Amino acid sequence: TVDPDGVKAYVTLQENNALAIVDIASATLVDVVGLGFKDHSLAGNYMDSSDRDPNGAPVANIISRPVFGMYQPDSIASFTVDGQTYLITANEGDARTWGPFNEESRVSSLDLDNTVFPTEAALKNNASLGRLNVTNKLGDTEIDGDFDALYAFGARSFSIWNTSGVQVYDSGDDIEQTVLAQDPTHFNYSHDDNSTLESRSDNKGPEPEAATVAKIGSKTYA
């Protein structure tokens, strides 16, 4: 997206969880800003992390999980309020895969640090975090072969940032909570014909992909 005066462009670097700021006139890169992580253990940031809960049955279960979400936005748009430009992102998430390289693993396949995750066996159950896809390239902070933190793809939300890449708002778990309340039959549903309830819960959930902004009268809508 481009700011209103046409000076700078803002480009999402989705798989790298970052934002590039480009000077248009000189066609040069001004900055690359990391977007950070979302703590799904905090109230308001909860998630449904399994397509088989409880006991293998598909039931919506939006709760606190010891997982960080990588925002990894796909679409980005900009808008102005009181002379200040803001960016809005749809935090879809996407894994890096090419050739034999694949950073995607289910939590059940990873060795977790027992100090950080004392209930490892329970967490790796399919009804808990076992089915959740996370990156296998981030989280071994002690570099000892086990994972001290878990990072899932996408943040299941939309965010608003200032033009320096500082987050000023995130929708938290509103998308999952709203879909569950308004259309529970299609909660975390896939778009294919054979989808089932919460079939996407283990893989980016509602997966927001597009962001569009429009002004109607004096109000701005996204």
What are these regions (language model features)?
Residues 1-222:
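Beta-sheet-rich non-transmembrane sensory/scaffold domains
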